[in-house]
Regions:
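Start-transfer (signal-anchor) and selected internal transmembrane alpha helices
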Residues: 1-21, 104, 108-110, 114-115, ...
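Transmembrane signal-anchor helices characteristic of membrane glycosylation enzymes that use polyprenol
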Residues: 3-33, 49, 132, 188-189, ...
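Short helix- or helix-capping micro-motifs
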Residues: 18, 123-131, 138, 158, ...
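Extracytoplasmic catalytic/substrate-binding loops of multi-pass membrane glycan-assembly enzymes
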Residues: 28-41, 51-66, 74-76, 89-92
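Short acidic/glycine- and proline-prone juxtamembrane loop motifs at membrane-interface regions
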Residues: 33-34, 135-149
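Transmembrane-helix motifs of polytopic, lipid-linked glycan transferases
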Residues: 92, 96-117, 155, 159
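Membrane-interface transmembrane helices that cradle and orient dolichyl/undecaprenyl
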Residues: 114-117, 156-177, 213
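Perimembrane helix-loop-helix junctions
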Residues: 159-168, 186, 199-230
């Protein structure tokens, strides 16, 4: 009975632990820390509708700008490194907004490991490793792009793993659904930082290998490789 409820109970427990590790005293430091000086400033440009030059794609900074907008921030703070946040900047909410992406990574890691058909002990080990990894927890607690990058990397991997398990139901509605979600996740991760293209490479190499095996199997009917056309 417990095993049947595990896919529901386990992610709830892991998410609760993630909430603690990512949100506990997240607003204690009221100083602009590390790259908050850059990405907070870029978010301010969006809020003030100003053009600026940046080496990264825009989605991450747009989400930072969204967190500022939801926090009631008007974009006037300069985000100078080491400066104290003024009272009218709700930096705690902005950090918590970013932390939400880091929190989601933990249940995603659990479900991904299950989709890859690992043993229960391995699934829990992977989930706890992601939960307790110090660098993952730390970068999720500041106004940075890394938690978003990790989150969309996890969604790409999970959707791809689920898509892979549906090979026997190729061209079904669910198969197409997870294929589209994989593509959407790839688009999101590539729109946060250029290193997200490694996710494209990962799925691309898998696709090449899968097609190579299918085209090389002469016993496989053509309809199993290409969708039927009227």
């Amino acid at each position: 009975v417990l095993a049947s409820w595990e896919p529901i109970i386990a992610p709830i427990i892991l998410t609760a632990l993630a909430l603690f590790t990512r949100l506990y005293q997240i607003g204690r430091s009221n100083i602009v820390t590390w790259d908050e000086a850059h990405f907070g400033k870029f978010g301010s440009h969006y809020l003030k509708r100003e053009f600026y030059f940046d080496v990264h794609p825009p989605l991450g900074k747009m989400l930072v700008g969204l967190s500022g907008y939801l926090a009631g921030y008007n974009g006037s703070f300069e985000f100078k490194s080491g400066e104290k946040y003024p009272e009218d900047v709700n930096y705690t909410f902005m950090r918590a907004f970013n932390a939400a992406f880091g929190i989601v990574c933990i249940p995603l890691a659990y479900y991904t490991a299950r989709e890859l058909n690992f043993r229960r002990a391995t699934v829990w080990l992977i989930s706890l490793m992601v939960l307790c990894e110090n660098s993952y927890a730390t970068i999720s607690r500041f106004i940075l792009l890394d938690s978003m990058l990790l989150c969309f990397t996890f969604t790409t991997t999970m959707c791809w793993a689920r898509f892979h398990r549906l090979q026997r139901d190729s061209f079904s509605l669910e198969w197409y659904g997870w294929l589209c979600l994989t593509g959407l996740s790839i688009g999101c991760v590539c729109s946060v930082k250029w290193v997200g293209f490694f996710c494209t490479a990962l799925v691309g190499l898998y696709t090449i290998d899968d097609l190579w095996n299918k085209f090389g199997d002469l016993k496989m009917p053509r309809v199993s490789v290409c969708p039927p056309f009227p």
